[in-house]
Amino acid sequence: GVLAGRDGAAELLKDALALYDLRFWNEEEGLSCDTWNTEFTELDPYRGLNANMHTVEAFLAAADVTGDEKYRVRAGRIIDHVLVWAKDNNWRIPEHFSSDWVPDLECNKDRPDDQFKPYGATPGHGIEWARLITQWVLSTYKEDKAGAAPYIEAAENLYNRAVADAWNADGAPGICYTTDWNGKPVVHDRMHWTLAEAINTSAVLSNVTD
């Protein structure tokens, strides 16, 4: 809306970022919390990477639109956390955490197809993180290829792990929704957004790594 010159868009963005800074972003942790009640009096102890993934996406857009580089820096801080967790877990990204950011790898094991907090790894998110990391590193490091290289390699690791685990994993075409921590499919559904992200990320990584 801001780039399109829509009336009120700049003010709406300013208000949204101010609220996010106040209620959701934790500067000390370098991560975002997940859920408040509507009165902003009770913060849910659950912490999750789905919210932080979309926060990275929003921060990159905010940096581009406003010119305020603090949002790009914040996106990088989130990414650095995610890469530590992913590397420690064979590049399968933990999704669910306690309030002090300890991964809960057993979350919803008894309800693996929970709509908002499914059990296990979500390969589509690994693919999406790979694209976001690449987008961030290109806009941050620009011509500094040596500085960018470890992040590009990490993005490839996330992408390759997700595809190896989930592509045609159960004999059916497409990318399964979730796997366990050994890469075995759990929820076999095929989501439209997963394939869309895979096509997007494939194109991005191909352009960057060729």
Predicted ranges, named:
Residues 1-210:
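Glycan-recognition and catalytic cores of secretory/periplasmic carbohydrate-active enzymes
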